Amino acid sequence: MTRFIPPATEVLIVADCWQAEAEAEAIVLRAIEAAAAMTDADTADAELAVMLTDDAGVQTLNANWRGIDKPTNVLSFPALQPEGDAPDDAPKMLGDIAIAYQTTRREADDEGKPFDHHLSHLAVHGFLHLVGYDHEKDAEAEAMESLEREILAQLGVPDPYADQDRVN
């Protein structure tokens, strides 16, 4: 039996606004581990980074990488895997996730959700993008949202889609 090994996750707090959320790093780490445990992704010897930034930081990333000059709640950047064989001891890079504080806070407040629940959802959502899930087509969206619900239920977070549209 193979033992589950979560990915090594580095959480980088790059905007002072996150200092108001003392548990943000622990929330993100718990959400990533839960998501990794419930997917078929091989996360042993894998690494990813989560950047907790502000709306301006996410807006810059969104403009540079997606051509959309506005902030959003979460962005995921799956790592390109190198061609050829990597050294046996090289970690597998899953990619990077960026989460915008002001948008996350505003959405949680507008939807009457606890901030930690919404942050958990965005971390799970971002991780699923790194391991190949998407929501461009209806069938993909249904599969991704169903898995998000299952993962979040394991974390004690209610269905995030019960009263809203999909995460961008």
From Swiss-Prot:
Zn(2+) binds at residues 125, 129, 135. It is found in: Cytoplasm. Its EC number is 3.1.-.-. InterPro entries: MetalPrtase_cat_dom_sf_prd, YbeY, YbeY_CS. GO terms for biological process: rRNA processing. The keyword Cytoplasm applies. Its cofactor is Zn(2+). GO terms for cellular component: cytoplasm. Keywords: Cytoplasm, Endonuclease, Hydrolase, Metal-binding, Nuclease, Ribosome biogenesis, rRNA processing, Zinc. The keyword Nuclease applies. PROSITE patterns: UPF0054 (PS01306). GO terms for molecular function: metalloendopeptidase activity; RNA endonuclease activity; zinc ion binding. Disulfide bonds: none annotated. Binds 1 zinc ion. It is an enzyme of class 3 (hydrolase). Belongs to the endoribonuclease YbeY family. Single strand-specific metallo-endoribonuclease involved in late-stage 70S ribosome quality control and in maturation of the 3' terminus of the 16S rRNA. NCBIfam families: rRNA maturation RNase YbeY. PANTHER family: ENDORIBONUCLEASE YBEY, CHLOROPLASTIC (PTHR46986:SF1). This is Endoribonuclease YbeY. It comes from Rhodopseudomonas palustris (strain BisB18).
